Amino acid sequence: MSNQVPLKRLFKVILVIRCVQALLTRTFFQADEFWQSLEPAHYMAFGYGELTWEWSFGLRSYAFPLIFQIGYTLVKYAAISCELIVQTATDWVLLFVANVIPNSEFGWEMVQEMRSFPEEIRGFIEYQGVIYAPKLIMAVLAAIGEFHVILLAEKLYKLTMDKSDDSKGSDKKHSTVINFTLVATVSNFFNCFFITRSFINSFEMILTSVSLYYWDWTSGEHIESFDFLKSLIIGTFTVLQRPTNAFIWLILGGYMILNLVLSKRWRKLFSLLIKVICASFISISTNLCIDYYFYGYITIPVLKFIKFNCTSSLSKFYGVAPWNFHVFQSLPIVAGYSLPLLIHSFFCSLTKKRFLSPLVNPFLQIKTVVLLNVILYSLIPHKEFRFIYPLQPFFIILSVFDGIWLLQKYGSTATTRTMEFFSQVMWILPVVSMVASMLLSTLHESGTVAVMDYLHSIRNIDSIGFIMPCHSTPWQSHFHRNDVKELWAITCSPPLHLLTDPDANAKLPFYMDESDYLYDNISKFMYQHFPPVFRKSLRSPGKQYTYEWPEYLVIFEDLDSQFMNDYLVDSMYIEETRFFNSLVHWDKRRSGDIIIYHKMP
């Protein structure tokens, strides 16, 4: 009897898991999670926020933040609706007291108390929505992406299944493929930690997963199908968000073209060309409209992105990693506990099916994509773990099919006792992986998020200043206040003036941003950019200071122990509270707790 796994139920399972995970996540990973997605969306939805230089320069497409703007807008109108409902209820209570119990002291006290309810309800709902709506949006997107990875695994299984196995438990193997893929994707450490965070790389991986499912893995048999057109549209749209995603599609497209040419299917080749043109037109037109909406003029950010990252040396401003970074660091972190299976998959066929040409084998194509992409990404000077995250669907597919291949090869000869032991311990790594990711998602660097929530809760604030490495905390996407007169932080803009300088490569190592100047000589920076902290009478006559001492001062413990604690002695500042942030940190400047100083009147 067939033991089919209900795929629709799987989507619900993934969705619940990712929603819980997203709602529990309260830590900071990297600045782009907030500053390149939520902050511009907040700026457009609520009319205030801080746009980084990338948005002023036109380097980013607004397609990804637009999703969050839609969520924010719904939240805003939901809050207004609730305010109107509560206001109506308050008015009815007022009418009741005035006409029925006009002499009741308690009634009038209740009316007085309720006057602030509508505004408070609106503020509460709006703030909670601003915090949690993006999390739920990413949870839904993550579930869609991971569900399509499972569908892709099922599709590849059916395509590569040896027909001679039809009567030999193929239904059981089918269920095994789906179940293994579910466990592999849901329990993957980096998926658990990263996929529901509002990074463009998460969005890129999700779109890539969906597009790969609709891709024609027969190398041309289904080129004329609507599913293939959907794959091309999503794929080209993804490239417009992250140009390096083209590394994937150029390789898969190259395989398809080569197979069509070798088999002399010229009509199919012509159909492919037409489909690519149509898909590109749809994607580019859509993206142009979205970016015109944000920027107010026609622009193609992907061209500026390529210019900044490929034709200039300015990307090195954000760090240069060794050539083997992705091999020895990114791959183990992104692939997680399935890394041994991923490596082993390159040394076995993964399928018994014989194809008319080896070039048609989907697993060969996938291995080529992984190998060449890792090489190409390794050639880029600036490297981060998340840059290879779009390859995650390939990592999972190769790991799952390699695990099944090993199970088939050695499972039949293993003893019952061995198989029982294996079935019991096989859950250890997935469970440990999920627990470890949740500990990081709830504890490590939690202070940088908690401090913004705390500042939001303070009723009346005149000014806030952050003396710490730039973009160390979220901004209005978590603070959500436009009633603070001064809200500032130390900056770190790159040397855009070197973009067209032929000597940029030589000058770049000597460029220092504001954060660099701060930590290079803290006391000098304070003297040059801040007035005396003790008395206004000590200010230099006529001198303009970059910053004024704020009512609330936010710093890391490292700066406090190095300088600020002694510097603020006998000043009007007292330590109001502190938040745990990390036990250890790769950046010493961000080590320890986050401390809030309050300047007393």
Curated annotation (Swiss-Prot):
What's an example GO cellular component term for this entry? Answer: endoplasmic reticulum membrane
Question: Taking the first listed entry, what is the main subcellular location of this protein, grouped into a coarse class?
Answer: endoplasmic reticulum
Which parts pass through the membrane?
66-86, 133-153, 176-196, 243-263, 270-290, 327-347, 360-380, 387-407, 421-441
Entry superkingdom: Eukaryota
Q: Which InterPro entries match?
A: GPI_mannosylTrfase (IPR005599)
Give the GO molecular function terms.
Answer: alpha-1,2-mannosyltransferase activity
Question: How does the record say this protein sits in the membrane?
Answer: Multi-pass membrane protein
**UniProt enzyme class:** transferase
Q: Where in the cell is it found?
A: Endoplasmic reticulum membrane
- Keywords on this record? Endoplasmic reticulum, Glycoprotein, Glycosyltransferase, GPI-anchor biosynthesis, Membrane, Transferase, Transmembrane, Transmembrane helix
Q: What does this protein do?
A: Mannosyltransferase involved in glycosylphosphatidylinositol-anchor biosynthesis. Transfers the third mannose to Man2-GlcN-acyl-PI during GPI precursor assembly.
Q: Member of which family?
A: Belongs to the glycosyltransferase 22 family. PIGB subfamily.
Q: What protein name applies here? A: GPI mannosyltransferase 3
Origin organism of this chain? Kluyveromyces lactis (strain ATCC 8585 / CBS 2359 / DSM 70799 / NBRC 1267 / NRRL Y-1140 / WM37) (Yeast)
